[in-house]
Amino acid sequence: MSSSELVDTDEWVVTALKAIAHPQRMAIMRWLRDPESFPPQLEPASEVGVCLKHIQARMGASQSTVSQYVAVLQRADLVHCTKIGQWSHYRRNEDALARLNQLLPEII
């Protein structure tokens, strides 16, 4: 790995760890592990993700607060967003999480 790739990787790891280093964002990531635990949706949660309104209801926070939380996770590439009509659905980016899981032992 070149030094510029290493720097990019290190910066991504820092961004990802900062994103999940918050109790509510960590909870969202944990909840999204089991999308079927949320109320049924028109589109299967396992395919498109969980609607933001369901995450908001589980968290008991305002829509704007939950939107900010998932935006941080999305900027860190830890979640994907799928828009269906006016609704945003979120699911974990398992490839990025596997990469993070692979890189952490090299750091710690």
Regions found by a protein language model. Give the residues of each.
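Alpha-helical residues within the helix-turn-helix
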Residues: 57, 68, 74-75
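Beta-hairpin "wing" of winged helix-turn-helix
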Residues: 74-84, 91
